[in-house]
């Protein structure tokens, strides 16, 4: 059992617990949000659910080496990394850089992602925190992807060239 992949999976699970709570609360307290805001939040929750599957499978693979198939881990970690970076970009782009404590003076339109709750400032802060933890989750998945690539290459998953001449015995 290797320690570094195990620590990475636990870090991913901690970030996922926090993200599930934050984004789940945004969904639960949704009151007449715009369609584009709902789509961004729902996509983020889809990415979180996918990340749960990858992190739990990675945790099982880190504990039980017989389950760890390097190519499968590589594909799972690559997919989770890709979806996490897309969700982080979507949340950051849709949110912008607001002052969540002073939304009255902001110039955002009625379709802005933080509008659509009884307490828009709370929703704004939860989405801000969700964006930060999505980027932290990306760092953890990127590290796991790097380890998966190294493991895949170590087990002979890549094409290696070696000496092709055989020794001639006279």
Feature names for model-found ranges:
Residues 27-31, 89-106, 155-156:
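Juxtamembrane interfacial secondary-structure elements that flank transmembrane helices
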Residues 32-44, 115-132:
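Juxtamembrane membrane-interface segments at transmembrane-helix boundaries in membrane proteins
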Residues 22-27, 123-128, 153:
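Charged, low-complexity, helix-prone segments enriched in Lys/Glu/Asp/Gln
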Residues 1-6, 66-67, 108, 112, ...:
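Intrinsically disordered terminal tails
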Residues 32, 64, 71, 100-103, ...:
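Residue-level signature of transmembrane alpha-helix interfaces in integral membrane proteins
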Residues 98-123:
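Short acidic, low-complexity segments enriched in Ser/Thr/Gly/Pro
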Residues 2-19, 23, 37-98, 137-151:
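Signature of small four-pass
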């Amino acid at each position: 059992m290797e320690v570094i992949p195990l620590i990475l999976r636990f870090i991913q699970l901690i970030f996922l617990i926090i993200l599930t709570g934050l984004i789940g609360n945004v969904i639960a307290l949704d009151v007449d949000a715009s369609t584009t805001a709902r789509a961004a939040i729902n996509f983020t929750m889809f990415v979180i659910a996918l990340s749960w599957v990858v992190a739990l499978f990675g945790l099982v693979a880190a504990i039980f080496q017989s389950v760890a198939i390097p190519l499968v881990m590589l594909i799972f970690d690559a997919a989770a990394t890709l979806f996490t970076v897309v969700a982080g970009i979507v949340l950051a782009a849709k949110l912008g850089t607001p002052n969540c404590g002073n939304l009255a003076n902001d110039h955002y339109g009625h379709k802005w992602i933080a509008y659509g709750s009884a307490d828009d400032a709370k929703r704004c802060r939860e989405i801000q925190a969700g964006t930060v933890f999505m980027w932290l989750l990306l760092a953890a998945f990127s590290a796991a992807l790097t380890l998966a690539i190294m493991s895949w290459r170590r087990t002979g998953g890549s094409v290696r060239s070696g000496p092709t001449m055989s020794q001639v015995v006279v």
